[in-house]
Amino acid sequence: MRRREFIALVGSASAWPLTARSQQVTVPVIGVLVPSAVSSMQNRLPAFRQGLKETGYAEGNVAIEFRWAEGQYDKLPALAADLVRGRADVIVTLGGTVTALAAKAATNTIPIVFIIGADPVELGLVNSFGRPGGNITGITTISMFGGKHMELLFEMVPEAEARLGLLVNPANPLVESLVRPAVDQLGQRLVLVEARTESDFEPAFAMLAKQGARGLIVWEEPFLNSRADQIAALAIRYAMPVIHSVRNFALAGGLMSYGVVYADLFHQIGIYTGRILNGTKPADLPVLQPSKFELVINLKTAKALGIAVPRTLLARADEVIE
């Protein structure tokens, strides 16, 4: 995805080709590696830029060079290598453990700032949360939503415990290890369905219906997060109670969402990036974990599905869509 296309879709952005640096006043360059498409970041990048601004960086004194994998994770190593060859001053990986791993494999000298959903110590990205060491730091959610999503969905739809669907992306190399707890807990009661491209969603929902799933959890993962609207439309068509990680899912008609406030994460990543450009070493910036989560319930969808939302659940909701 080149600069002209990006600006047309996202709006004003400081995105100049790295090769053009010699033709302009030298400014620091931020390489941004994204596993998904441009559209998935439209609502989040302003928070990233705001974090940069608070550390002294805005259009005119910093260049931002984007690389988009468009959901094709096998492209990430080459895209990361391209940013390294272009001599980016810092590389930011916006979403997905596989993205951070690709950047880490590409360089052990250029600073890297990540957002991931797994334990960075177990993955070998950092030495510890408090003292990352090396050239990498960032934010992790440690895939904390699987158990909480199950708890919330069972409270909303108790019968889902008898037959629960789980939607995953098989293209993600971490899928097996991250869904293992659900498989171990539910055994034969779990209906595992997959989607690695947009054309896979319809067959996945058809399989859920055929197997008698009474509810569905969408695994928190960059590609699946970026297709929240499409998943919501299918959930409505198949009358399937579904919980997702991203707020847009509930806004689009899905039953409910529970997850981090992505604007907060992107804002903090912007701050970390700016601090690194100002001279702070990634090794001295602790890996952060989010402390704020949002539960959004679409009451209109619940009524259409014949679900009486428990008052205890409504009382805990941060937002109720009526």
Region annotations inferred by a language model:
Residues M1-E322:
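Short hydrophobic alpha-helices and adjacent helix-cap/hinge residues
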